[in-house]
Amino acid sequence: MSKKEEKTKVRLPRGFVDRTSAQLHALETMIAQIHEVYESYGFEALETPIFEYTDVLGKFLPDSDRPNAGVFSLQDEDEQWMSLRYDLTAPLARYFAENFEILPKPYRSYRSGFVFRNEKPGPGRFRQFMQLDADIVGSSTVAADAEICMMAADSLERLGIQRHDYVIRLSNRKILDGVLELIGLQGDEQAEKRLTILRAIDKFDKFGMEGVRLLLGKGRLDESGDFTKGAGLSQQESEPILSLISVGAETAEATLDNLKNIVGHTIRGLEGIHELEEMQTIFSKNGYQDRIKIDPSVVRGLDYYTGPVFEAELLFDVLNEEGQKVVFGSVGGGGRYDGLVARFRDEAVPATGFSVGVSRLMAALHNLGKCPVKKTVGPVVVLMMDKDPEYVAYYQKMVMQLRHAGIRSELYLGAAGIKAQMKYADRRHAPCVVIQGASERQEGKVQIKDLIEGARLSAEIKDNQTWRESRPAQIMVDENQLVQAVQEILVAHQFL
């Protein structure tokens, strides 16, 4: 006896998910709404490949301990390393540099697509996820940063998120640079330590002031026993940084005054403060002063930011996995990155942009009851009552008539009998089925069964004999009335 062939085990790679039709529709609807806002600001769509040469992407990910610096990579036939993009910003920098001579400057573009990170997966943390970005490349004025912030606010409101439910938090990397200058951490030789400090501050929302203090010092031991090595700063060196992230006040003016007291005597820090003041004037003149808040604790975790940085934060409570109320938190962020395009050119190219975390934003809309869910309805199903080729062609003609009238429909193409076909139509969420056997064909008639109305009536009729005799929600019409009859059923259920 031959050995039974072993079947391949069905499994999904960790960190990846499948998406259903309903999820995809909700996602497409949300993205289309955001695109409308981006288009209204004069941005145009761009698509770049999911693969780029590894050296083009650069090494900017925070998870540097993972293989290949946190990216998925392979070699092509020329033995050049290529990697799946980890964000949409690095590919934009490559595209702009490659098409520098023909693109308008400043260049406004938006992109949406999947990005990939070779990171340890966990709850809510995936290796493939979608981002939605908008950037202005070629503008050095902070008016561009201000416009990006205002556009982020408008995008959230376009999705139905109310003003009291969100805030755009804003700061400037130059202010942090001023603090680091005060404690002697300027210069290329201190770059790695500055990056560790940056990522420690970026954990403020998650770990609080004490957690940041530990990460600035020797390190932090979490509840699971994992130890994260810190920046190794002394208490004296840590204090100016801790003061910086805690000086936020009720008004922008008060916060800016507090910042001047900390870094106002450094050239870099004062430059960052003046940029925030200029942006605040733009917000006030355009009615955004209550939606965009200066918050010095915002730094962003990637090290290519060079100026204003911002995050979109949702302020309402949700239940976490332990059933505790927590603030939903960030659903996107961005900032100025004047050095990224310059990697490819001799001249500096200023740029600023914003990235939406699509999955988190979709979860937020679901919690608010604003997730754009289409009323579930499948296609009208024409049943296969006779499998003779001549009759199959006849059934297909019915389907084509419905499709030409704009009605989503399909011909059942399985091998099952009438009972199983009806069950199939139920599983497809069909609003109705079209039935034509030999007797109906001879009379030039078709039966149409309204499955939605039938389900409702079946709950009211308890007697099987009454059910069979009444044949609820089932009508007989002439063949030439098929389209009209189906349309009337769809209109009655508000599907047309």
From Swiss-Prot:
Gene3D superfamilies: Anticodon-binding domain, Bira Bifunctional Protein, Domain 2. Keywords: Aminoacyl-tRNA synthetase, ATP-binding, Cytoplasm, Ligase, Nucleotide-binding, Protein biosynthesis. It is found in: Cytoplasm. One of its GO terms (biological process) is histidyl-tRNA aminoacylation. GO terms for molecular function: ATP binding; histidine-tRNA ligase activity. PANTHER family: HISTIDINE--TRNA LIGASE (PTHR11476:SF7), HISTIDYL-TRNA SYNTHETASE (PTHR11476). Its main location: cytoplasm. Belongs to the class-II aminoacyl-tRNA synthetase family. Its EC number is 6.1.1.21. This is Histidine--tRNA ligase. NCBIfam families: hisS (TIGR00442). InterPro entries: aa-tRNA-synth_II, aa-tRNA-synth_II/BPL/LPL, Anticodon-bd, Anticodon-bd_dom_sf, His-tRNA-ligase, HisRS-like_core, HisRS/HisZ, HisRS_anticodon. GO terms for cellular component: cytoplasm. It catalyses: tRNA(His) + L-histidine + ATP = L-histidyl-tRNA(His) + AMP + diphosphate + H(+). The gene is hisS. SUPFAM superfamilies: Class II aaRS ABD-related, Class II aaRS and biotin synthetases. Homodimer. PROSITE patterns: AA_TRNA_LIGASE_II.
